[in-house]
Amino acid sequence: TDMDKRKEYKPLIEELFKMAYECNKDYGIEGKLGLGNMWANINPTYSYNKTHTHPNSMWSGVYYIKVPKKSGKLFLEDPRPGPNTHMPRRVEGMPEALWRVCAYEPAEGRMIFFPSWLPHGVDINMNTEKGEKNWRISVSYNFIQL
């Protein structure tokens, strides 16, 4: 898409770049970044996004524009094969470092970044309001290292 070329998205893109460089800093990564691509997602009732990754990108993420109730959480999965081979019963309140999947409730104005290699998806939108009221609208993006 040409979203990154449109003036109405300039303030969002400026914030995305700030956050992308913060991610680089946190991970000890040097070098310039470019916005590889960005696109809008419109998810009506019963839509979802299967687990996937973003090859050839550095950072990926989502910015939530419209979020009706029960419209589906973003989930991030542990990519290591080992934790899938044995899933022992865990006590309640276990440390986050031991979680296999982390889920984030969408909220309007929330911006989430993650490494592009991290498997992720979106749970089913269970909001059944009529028409466009049930749409979850977000912008997704990929940053590349230049």
Question: Which stretches of residues belong to each language-model region?
Answer:
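Hydrophobic, well-ordered secondary-structure segments
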Residues: 12-22, 100, 106-107, 128, ...
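Short coil/turn motifs at secondary-structure junctions
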Residues: 66-68, 121, 127, 144-146
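Non-heme Fe(II)/2-oxoglutarate
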Residues: 1-30, 48
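Amphipathic alpha-helical surface "interface" segments used
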Residues: 1-5, 37-42
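A short coil-to-beta-strand element that immediately follows conserved catalytic motifs
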Residues: 28-38
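Catalytic core of non-heme Fe(II) oxygenases with the double-stranded beta-helix
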Residues: 43-113, 123, 132-135, 139
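A short beta-turn/loop motif at secondary-structure boundaries
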Residues: 32, 129-131
